[in-house]
Swiss-Prot record:
Main location: cytoplasm
Keywords: Chaperone, Cytoplasm
MF annotations from Gene Ontology: ATP binding; metal ion binding; protein folding chaperone; protein-folding chaperone binding; unfolded protein binding
GO cellular component, one term: cytoplasm
Gene3D superfamilies associated with the record: GroES chaperonin
Task of the protein: Together with the chaperonin GroEL, plays an essential role in assisting protein folding. The GroEL-GroES system forms a nano-cage that allows encapsulation of the non-native substrate proteins and provides a physical environment optimized to promote and accelerate protein folding. GroES binds to the apical surface of the GroEL ring, thereby capping the opening of the GroEL channel.
Originating species: Colwellia maris
InterPro entries membership: Chaperonin_GroES, Chaperonin_GroES_sf, Chaprnonin_Cpn10_CS, GroES-like_sf
Family indicated by similarity: Belongs to the GroES chaperonin family.
Protein name listed in UniProt: Co-chaperonin GroES
Keyword Cytoplasm found: yes
GO BP annotations, alphabetical order: chaperone cofactor-dependent protein refolding
SMART domains per UniProt: Cpn10 (SM00883)
Length: 96
């Protein structure tokens, strides 16, 4: 897949959601929630500040992240794979 996001945008691939409940029951279809964990597959050059400088992003390709699904998150299919395009500010944490 060859795609390059602009500015402070990040492209992530969602991790599969857990398909079992806490009690061990296998969940089917719409009973499983979409995961808010993802792997970063591409990052932009950085955020352009008011003074014209570019602040590099804190995330890098390969990082495992937790993100907020909100208004600015865009779902796209690229090369047959579903990816999410979001701003770095939509990322809540990097899983270490």
């Amino acid at each position: 897949m060859s795609i390059r996001p602009l500015h402070d945008r990040v492209i992530v691939k969602r991790k599969d959601a857990e398909s079992k409940s806490e009690g061990g029951i296998v969940l089917m279809g719409s009973a499983t929630e979409k995961s808010t964990r993802a792997e970063v597959i591409a990052v932009g050059n950085g955020r352009i500040l008011e003074n014209g400088e570019v602040r590099p992003l804190d995330v890098k390709v390969g990082d495992q992240v937790i993100f907020s699904e909100g208004y600015g998150v865009k779902t796209e299919k690229i090369d047959g794979e579903e990816v999410l395009i979001l701003s770095e500010s939509d990322i809540l944490a990097i899983v270490e």
